[in-house]
């Protein structure tokens, strides 16, 4: 069995250790992740429904693609890797903002990117059960209503992105 190692970081996002992913989550240690917002030419956002095989937030709607920054990797190398692994595409990624770790964010520093792509996509079945395009106004409404079908991380990212 392959053990996934992640970098543990301090409050300034400096690497201080490396630990197995399971330990990082169990001990609530700070670590790094990326989230990518994929928009089409109609300004709709691609959402992914997380696989029921996932250990966290299974079956909930989330950003277009996301993942942990592996030990030895940077945000800049992780984002295109995750986009390709989860959706089977490449695109020019634009960095938007970085969120600081909180309990609601799983103690992750999250670098958020955006890109434009109209598909087609090849969703990774181990990661994603479904993908769909959604109008930004519909997302605004669902996020404002605290829709339980969306991950808390996605709602936090969306509010920041939209200035809500």
For each predicted feature, which ranges?
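Residues that flank catalytic or metal-binding motifs in active/ligand-binding sites
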Residues: 4, 32-34, 65, 109, ...
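A glycine-rich, hydrophobic loop/mini-helix early in the fold
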Residues: 35-65
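Short, well-ordered strand-loop elements centered on a beta-strand within folded domains, enriched
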Residues: 15-18, 43-49, 120-124
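Nudix hydrolase/Nudix homology domain
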Residues: 19-22, 59, 71, 97-100, ...
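The catalytic Nudix box helix
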Residues: 46-47, 64-96
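Acidic, metal-coordinating catalytic segment for phosphate/diphosphate chemistry
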Residues: 1-35, 41
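A residue-level structural signature of the nucleotidyltransferase/glycosyltransferase Rossmann-like core
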Residues: 6, 44-45, 131-132
């Amino acid at each position: 069995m392959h053990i996934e190692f992640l970098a543990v970081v301090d409050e300034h996002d400096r690497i201080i250790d490396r630990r197995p992913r399971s330990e990082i989550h169990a001990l609530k240690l700070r670590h790094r992740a990326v989230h990518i917002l994929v928009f089409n030419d109609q300004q709709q956002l691609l959402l992914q429904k997380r696989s029921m095989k996932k250990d966290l937030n299974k079956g909930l709607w989330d950003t277009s693609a996301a993942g942990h920054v592996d030990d030895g990797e940077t945000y800049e190398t992780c984002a295109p890797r995750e986009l390709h692994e989860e959706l089977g595409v490449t695109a020019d990624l634009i960095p938007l903002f970085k969120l600081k770790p909180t309990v609601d964010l799983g103690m992750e520093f999250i670098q958020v990117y955006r890109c434009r792509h109209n598909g087609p996509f090849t969703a990774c079945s181990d990661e994603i059960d479904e993908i769909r395009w959604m109008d930004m106004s519909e997302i605004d409404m669902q996020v404002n209503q605290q829709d339980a079908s969306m991950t808390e991380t996605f709602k936090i990212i969306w509010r920041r992105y939209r200035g809500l």
